[in-house]
Amino acid sequence: MKKYFFLFLGLSVLFMSCSDDDGIKNGPSPDPDPTADVAAQDFMWKAMNLWYFWQADVPDLADDRFSTNAEYTAFLENNSNPENFYYSICNRHEEIYGEETAIDRFSFANEDYTELVSSLSGISQSNGLEFGLGLIGDTDNVFGFVQYIWPDSDASTKDIQRGEFFTRVDGVQLTVNNYINLLFGDNSTYTLGMATVADNTISDSDKEVSLTKIENQIENPILVAKTLDVNGTKVAYLMYNRFLSSFNEDLNDAFAKFKADGATELVLDMRYNPGGSVNTSRLLASMIYGTNTSDVYIKQRWNAKIQAEFSDEFLTDYFANSTGASAINSLNLSRIFVIATGDSASASELVMNGLDPYINVIHIGETTRGKNEFSITLVDDSENNFIYNSDREGNINSQNSWGLQPLVGRNENADGFYDYTSGLSPEIELSEDLTNLGVLGDVNEPLLARALQEISGASAKIDFTVEMPAESFTSSRLHTPLKDNMFLDKPLPTNLELE
C-alpha cells in the first residue's frame, strides 16, 4: 500500500493525502482487542514504530514484534500507565535508566497535546521568573537562584531580581523530593522564602515574595539587544533565550539595528537557551554569517524507513536569504563570540555547530548540554500518520489526548560533524558566579566582560575568579512543556511515498 502526503512538522502541520487507503504500513499492523483499555498505548506504539529515530534499535518496536493481535494486546495491557509505557519503548530512556547510562535523554510525552502544541509557540502558564536550582552542600535541601525575569510578567512587578536566592515555598524548605510539586505543581500562586549568601553559606532571610502564574503568557526570547562601543569597535550583544518562530521578524529587526549601528562583532548570549525551532536556528545563523543559499547549514538523518524516502536535497538545509516575510539582515561576520553553558541545548548548539565550518566560533562559558537530535509532535490521528495538524484537531481520537514529542532524527553540519552528545566544550572556560551574577548586558557582567576582553585584546582589568560556581541540577525552563526540545518545522516534500 502506498501513501503520498504533504505535511509540516512542528507547531503548524498541514497534511494532504492523495489516496483513499487506510494509512502507512511498514509490516504487519497489529490491532488491540477493541474491549481493551489501551488506546493511548496503541497510539504510542504505532507512532513510535513509524517515526522514532532509534526504532530499529528497540526490539519492542520491531515491525515483526507481534505475531497475533492477542499478543499485541497483552503487551499493551502489561503497562497500564501511558507515560511509563512510552518511556519503556524508548531507547534506554533517562527516565528509566538514569542520566549516566541513558541513550534517549530528551523524548517526552504530555497527556494534553494542546498544552504541548501551545508551548511550541512559547505560550505557557508562567509568573515570569526564570531560575536555576542547586543543592545545599551534601544535603537533599535545594536552593533557587534567579537568572532573569520576563518583562511585563507578574515577577517583573514584584520585589525580586536576578542574583537573588530562595530556599522555601509557602514556608516549606525545598528538597529534591518536593521541589517539583512546590514550584511546578498545580498551585498558580506561591510565596518564595528568600535567602542570602555569604562566605559560601546560604542563610534564610525574612523577605518573602508572592508570585502568580498567568495563563497564556508568551516570552519574547530577545531579552537584550544592544550595540556596545568597545574601544572604538561596535559590538552587537544579543541575549537570546529560546528559538521561537513567532519572533523571527523581531530577531531580524534586531539585526537590522545592529547593522545600522555599524556593528562588526557579535556576542551571542545563549547561556540559558534550551532550544526550539530548527528553522529559526537557520535564520539566526544566516543573520550572523550570510545569505548564500548554496551554503549547507545542516543535514538531517532519520530512521532507515523514513530516510530512504527523502532526497538529498530535502535532507539538506541551506543558509537563508529571507525569513519568509522579509529579506534577512546579515552581519556577514567571520567570527562570533558565543556565551553558552550547561543550560544551552539543542537549537543553541545547532547554531554553533552549523556555523563552525564557515566562521570562527569562540565559545565562552561551560560545556553545553549535548542534544543533537530533533523531534516532531505526534497525536492520535492515525489517518494523518499521527502527525499533528491544527486543521485536523477534530480528527484526533477524542478518547486519547496524549501528545508525543519523540526524537525522530539528528542534525550534522556541512562537514558531517554531529557527535556532541557530551556537549560542546568552550574555548574559554568560565562559569557564572553566584556571588557576582551581574546585570545581563552590562559590560561588567563577567561572561560578557570576558568576551569583550577577547575582542579588544586589552589586558585583564576584571578579576574573573569564580568564588561560588552556579551549579544547578535543573532549571525552571526544563519544567515547561517545551523543555529543551528542538523541533523540526519545515515541510516534507509533496511526493513523499512510504510503503
Please report, for each region that a protein language model flagged, where it lies by residue.
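Active-site-proximal loop/turn and secondary-structure-junction residues that shape catalytic pockets
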Residues: 215, 272-274
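Flexible, low-complexity junctional segments that flank or bridge functional domains
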Residues: 19-265, 280, 290, 470-499
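C-terminal "post-core" interaction segments
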Residues: 246-253, 258-265, 274-499
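Positively charged n-region of N-terminal signal peptides that target proteins for export
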Residues: 1-4
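C-terminal motif of bacterial Sec signal peptides marking the signal peptidase cleavage site
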Residues: 14-17
